[in-house]
Design a protein with these regions (language model features):
Chain B
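ABC ATPase nucleotide-binding domain helices that frame the ATP-binding cleft
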Residues: 46-49, 145
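ATP-binding/catalytic-site motifs of ATP-hydrolyzing domains
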Residues: 62, 68, 214
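Helix-to-loop junction immediately C-terminal to a conserved catalytic motif
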Residues: 53
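Conserved post-Walker A/P-loop segment of ABC ATPase nucleotide-binding domains
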Residues: 56-64
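Non-catalytic connector elements of ABC transporters
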Residues: 240, 250-375
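The feature captures the beta-strand-to-loop junction immediately N-terminal to the Walker
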Residues: 38-40
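ABC ATPase nucleotide-binding domains
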Residues: 34, 75-235
Length: 274, 375
């Protein structure tokens, strides 16, 4: 690392510029959402919360928000359940084809979204599934399973299999072992996976655009609004809210992921007496 | 056995695909004894223990605990409990809930359960630690919690898989004695798995020595040390100088032998040895040899030797010596009496040995190859 820095003295500057280029536009979004003017340009004219207030009255927006929550919630549950099985198998068992299968599961992370989206559309139409929310849910599940698997794998990595054996040895049933040992220890990882997969689905545009049909999700709705210059400030306000919400969810997810990794699950067993 | 049998393994075998991890295991354990399974890593000790615990079903053979055939009974319904090598302390529970974990289904009232937990914690000298978090415990304390958690179940047999291997040396030695004392005071049968011969010898009433999935010998530590039945057992427990010998006459309790380097001696017959033959093998423990500057008096055999190397251990000194007619370098262990190392490398000295110190190891199986290699 040190040698690399000596070889490329401009590396630090480059990194700073790169980050600025990447994130400054994102920071401009909330900035202009408070501006009284309807065009995005400096200098900013006055301060207002009107654009935010107007959001509450837009019916189609609220519908698309509901669609997004339905899609995000279903996706999160589906991909986390799938991820749970996969991660446990990858960490605990050495089986034939494990590495290849892991690679395939991670593939959606690197395939261009537009390709996934168009091929899914073709596939779903072929299977008789018309563009709809269930179609988006399936597409998003495919897309978010890699996130669930990698989060849950790190939770299982820290999990000594002897813990489950010890519980079983102490007379617990298989289900009891899962409830009293596996769940409390893996729990934070599960929460983290649910939050991350929800966020990814909530923010996803391309798949949703192809597969949602006449029930747009929030990003698809925003895209449709960008065509109307008069609606731009509202869109900026909505975008800013979305940004804040996503960051909040991801931070919470990271908190739980770390808790899972350090084994700081629930503190106390419920002391149920019979 | 006259004493009451608690565990009886007969013809127990465990195969993983083509690998046979445990082979034709016959073993009877007595109520209240401290038994150790000793052997090098990978010899099948853990597999044997896990079959007793119920985590693995034998491929063939039967396991009885207290007279009942438990071969197909799963771990959660066997009267055994296990202390895991990693201790497996539940990280999300405090010490009290860890120890009380298994009492959940016992039907005991909360008050009774709490009493049992604190009693078990007292037993392992962790009285009052109920509300400690698992991650606030040292390695030694985790070990005690794991013990208490198993003992609170009042098992008929306590199983321990390398229970001390994760502790550092001083703590390990202290725990050896403490575990032994604990076992004697509660009288539960302990079955411990270890690859550490000293651990097995200091703690156990009896030891079963395993190699390659096969139980080679079951005996008290003293018997294993004094009369090992095979060369591998002799080699694994304590140091041993192996010497080829010729058996001239096997009459009664003694064998007349011509021992390489040491000449004719009458060696006591080892009852644990399977078969004898003209080509014989004997062993002499390093501390049973006397080394002196002049020919020592009163020994059954004395020979001259050259000191090839010296190792200073503090409490003892090891001389590695060469004796004419003995194929391998011999080791002589001498207590460090007066803080002096009496011989230097290259010096000549005398060895003395009593016939009673020579261990009969039966037929010499690699005698043929050794003859072939001779120049
Ligand atoms: N679940 C398993 N599947 C396949 N092979 C195993 C399994 N458990 C143990 N073995 C093999 O059985 C042999 C004995 O293992 P083990 O009982 O753990 O030995 P030890 O405890 O004496 O070190 C080893 O070769 C090990 O690789
Ligand atoms: Mg082992």
């Amino acid at each position: 690392m040190k040698r690399l820095r000596r070889l490329l003295p401009g590396l630090g500057t480059y990194a700073a510029l790169y980050l600025a280029f990447l994130y400054l536009p994102v920071l401009l979004l909330p900035l202009f959402s408070f501006s009284e003017g309807t065009i995005v340009a400096f200098p900013i004219k006055g301060f207002t919360l009107d654009w935010y207030a107007q959001l509450g009255e837009a019916d189609t927006l609220l519908h698309s928000l509901a669609n997004s929550v339905i899609v995000g919630g279903s996706t999160a549950v589906l991909s986390t359940v799938l991820g749970l099985f996969a991660a446990r198998a990858y960490v605990r068992h050495r089986f034939f084809g494990r590495e290849i299968s892991e690679g395939i599961v991670m593939l959606p992370l690197v395939i261009p979204g537009i390709i996934v989206a168009s091929s899914m559309l073709v596939l779903f139409l072929f299977l008789g599934l018309r563009p709809s929310l269930p179609a988006v849910i399936l597409g998003h599940t495919f897309l978010t399973v890699p996130f669930a698997v990698s989060i849950l794998k790190s939770a299982f990595d820290e999990f000594d299999p002897a813990l489950e054996e010890a519980a079983y040895d102490l007379g617990e049933t298989t289900i009891g072992v899962f409830r009293r040992v596996t769940m409390p220890i893996i729990g934070p990882g599960i929460v983290s996976s649910l939050l991350v997969t929800f966020t990814v689905s909530f923010d996803e545009f391309v798949l949703a655009f192809f597969l949602s049909g006449n029930r747009p999700t929030l990003p698809v709705y925003i895209w449709s609004q960008i065509r109307f210059p008069a609606k731009l400030p509202n869109t900026l306000a909505l975008g800013s809210l979305l940004l804040a919400f996503s960051v909040l969810l991801l931070l919470t997810a990271e908190y739980f992921r770390r808790r899972a990794a350090t084994g700081q699950g629930a503190r106390k067993e419920s002391r149920d007496d019979r | 056995m006259t004493a009451e049998t608690i565990i009886e393994l007969s013809g127990v075998e465990k195969r993983f695909g083509t690998l046979t991890a445990v082979r034709d295991l016959d073993l009877e354990l007595v109520k209240g004894e401290f038994f150790s399974l000793l052997g090098p890593s990978g010899c099948g000790k853990t597999t044997a223990l896990r079959m007793i615990a119920g985590f693995q079903e034998p491929s063939s053979g039967t396991i009885r605990i207290d007279g009942e055939d438990v071969s197909t009974v799963p771990a959660n319904r066997r009267p055994t409990n296990m202390v895991f090598q990693s201790y497996a302390i539940f990280p999300h529970l405090d010490v009290g809930d860890n120890v009380g974990f298994g009492l959940h289904r016992s039907g005991l009232s909360r008050k009774e359960r709490r009493a049992r937990v604190s009693e078990a914690l007292e037993l392992v000298e962790l009285g009052g630690y109920e509300r400690r978090r698992a991650n606030q415990l040292s390695g030694g304390q985790q070990q005690r919690v794991a013990l208490a958690r198993a003992l609170v179940m009042r098992p008929k047999v306590l199983l321990l898989d390398e229970p001390l291997s994760a502790l550092d040396k001083n703590l390990r030695e202290a725990m050896q004695l403490e575990l032994r004392r604990l076992q004697q005071s509660i009288g539960i049968t302990f079955v411990m798995v270890t690859h550490d011969q000293y651990e097995a010898m200091t703690m156990s009433d009896r030891i079963g020595v395993m190699f390659n999935g096969q139980l080679e010998q079951v005996d008290t530590p003293q018997t294993l040390y004094a009369s090992p039945g095979t060369r591998s057992v002799a080699n694994f427990i304590g140091g041993m100088n192996f010497l080829p010998a010729r058996l001239h006459n096997e009459g009664g309790g003694t064998l007349d032998m011509e021992i390489a380097g040491f000449g004719a001696m009458a060696v006591g017959r080892n009852p644990n040895v399977a078969d004898h033959g003209r080509n014989a093998l004997v062993g002499i423990r390093p501390e049973q040899l006397e080394i002196a500057a002049h020919r020592p008096e009163g020994y059954d055999s004395t020979v001259q030797c050259r000191v090839a190397d010296i190792a200073f251990y503090g409490e003892s000194i090891h001389y590695f010596v060469e004796v004419d007619g003995v194929p391998e370098t011999m080791t002589v262990a001498v207590p460090n009496y007066f803080h002096s190392v009496d011989f230097t490398r290259g010096a000549t000295a005398w060895l003395g040995v009593q016939a009673a110190s020579v261990i009969d190891l039966g037929r010499n199986r690699d005698n043929e190859t050794q003859q072939g290699e001779k120049t």
